[in-house]
């Protein structure tokens, strides 16, 4: 299906949120699955609210997720002359008309309709107006068909039909001459030869109006697929009050792009009972026809579970690159000693996010300045001094270099001292990390190296002496 062309068309009035990211992902996967083209278009016709900062945030979010585009980014503001040509075409063909109704008049009509129990819609006052004071402020409206219905077969929701009597004459050009959203979208999609429009179902009500415009302009009507919305745990539409919604916020909180992609694709789409999909598997198996009609509920616990999976199975060298900014935010400028990939291998099994991993990795780069005194108090000082002396002495003479060897060495120390492993392991873990919540002793010694391990034991002994 090489003629398949899809687009992601965000408005640059904020960041890339998870709902928009899922829409982008579905479009990207559909294009990649069928060998089609994925286009990025920035819908910046709202010049008052659109910002370059928002554009940058959207591009940054998509790049982080790995959603590369084949064409674009295109900007709607570059096409204003083209939109005006199409407005004039409709005027010339009698398919659009000028409207001089003032906002207060329209509001009065809306209130009257509501009071009478009618659906508010423009009543066509200027549709057949003979006098046309062109020097007065006016908008331009599309002359929509008044009879019959406008229907389409949605790939997700099935057939949807709208009685034309319920659709009013859409404004396509404002009083200042700028085109409106629904009009620009139709022109762009038509000229970009978009074959499939995959977007959120909050656009369903726009679709019949856009179909009428396609037909009036003589353009082919694309195939539509409207994706159900994402809800919070309270079944309300996902928003900031449910937690982070920005893609970049999830990056900064320590989530991996593959985890977020995997989670987003499962918000509405399924492939049997499978939960974990690699990028390649998503491309191979995704089909918009398998997206459900019901809204999806955002579950942070499921995202955490997926993120933990990708951290646990991730390449330590790659994770090291991703972890460095999180350590830098904690004052660690140099992650070379100990080797960060080696450190990560001791933490992968237990961390759900990179932020959590960075917090747990901190002791490797910053020797503890204080110790868990409550945990140390469970052992008398003579015992602690004996353990620290025995371990330091054996480490000074050892040629061990790997965690299993250090674990064996500790067992020998326990046997020689007549101690149980917890009576050696816990004090040593506190001496090296400051806490009882740390990886295995052998792993810590391997990552820190023998010299740094001995130095930390000596500092702990000095702490006990005071």
From Swiss-Prot:
It holds the Pfam family tRNA-synt_1c. Its cofactor is Zn(2+). It is found in: Cytoplasm. Keywords: Aminoacyl-tRNA synthetase, ATP-binding, Cytoplasm, Ligase, Metal-binding, Nucleotide-binding, Protein biosynthesis, Zinc. Binds 1 zinc ion per subunit. Zn(2+) binds at residues 99, 101, 126, 128. A motif ('KMSKS' region) lies at residues 237-241. It is an enzyme of class 6 (ligase). It catalyses: tRNA(Glu) + L-glutamate + ATP = L-glutamyl-tRNA(Glu) + AMP + diphosphate. Its EC number is 6.1.1.17. A motif ('HIGH' region) lies at residues 10-20. GO terms for cellular component: cytosol. HAMAP family: Glu_tRNA_synth_type1 (MF_00022). Belongs to the class-I aminoacyl-tRNA synthetase family. Glutamate--tRNA ligase type 1 subfamily. This is Glutamate--tRNA ligase. The gene is gltX.
